[in-house]
Amino acid sequence: AGEDHGRGPYVQADLAYAYEHITHDYPEPTGTKKDKISTVSDYFRNIRTHSIHPRVSVGYDFGGWRIAADYARYRKWNNNKYSVNIKELLRNDNANSGGSHLNIKTRKTEHRENGTFHAASSLGLSAVYDFDTGSRFKPYIGMRVAYGHVRHQVRSVQQETIAVTTYPQNAASSVTTNAPIRKLPHHESRSISSLGFGAVAGVGIDITPNLTLDAGYRYHNWGRLENTRFKTHEASLGVRYRF
């Protein structure tokens, strides 16, 4: 609100720094959902990342209370994983007139995954109360409800290679391998759109009766994508203009 406590519509533009927390909950071994298999990858177990994004709002100032609708898009989080597992399948010693040698047969399994988790968009509605301090500085608090869209995608490929390593008694070892056996790629894509709830707080600094500098914080719980929870903490700096 301005110095004259005027009322009227306003627009606001912010640049927000978002701390994003993704938590993956696994069923207890003895729980009722112990046999439920989640299709959400283990990628998203306790991920902490961040992004910077713009946010725009339109609202109405009632001279103390404000109501505003806001919209924001977030950066996509992605990661690659590569793992190798080597398992011994067979071991034997061979002895003949020419000497002895050891054969070891192993299976090498290579697994590669590409995963993304994206808070694609958030459309929110906030109710905010500005505290009149008798100065240009006006702290505020409020509540927010938002319709958010979250996407998750994983693509994985796996191949196996069988190798036989021979260790002669008096010579260098040698390795014989077959052609890699590739399994069919696995791809999964999930999305959810749901209502989430959060809180907002901050301080407005009146530059002119119609222009306010806004430094704010907001917390938002986006809800669940199966058993994956997604939350954001955001710090923002912006300007608000009341008509």
Swiss-Prot record:
Keywords: Cell outer membrane, Membrane, Signal, Transmembrane, Transmembrane beta strand
Residues spanning the signal sequence: 1
Alphabetized InterPro entries for the sequence: OMP/PagP_b-brl, Porin_opacity
Location of this chain's protein in the cell: Cell outer membrane
Domain of life: Bacteria
GO CC annotations on file: cell outer membrane
Stored Gene3D superfamilies: 2.40.160.20
Keyword presence, Mitochondrion: no
A molecular function (GO) term: porin activity
Record Pfam families: Opacity (PF02462)
Family: Belongs to the opacity porin family.
Stated role: Implicated in a number of adherence functions. OPA proteins are implicated in pathogenesis and are subject to phase variation.
Protein name: Opacity protein opA59
Native species: Neisseria gonorrhoeae
Lineage summary: Bacteria, Pseudomonadati, Pseudomonadota, Betaproteobacteria, Neisseriales
Gene name in the database record: opaD
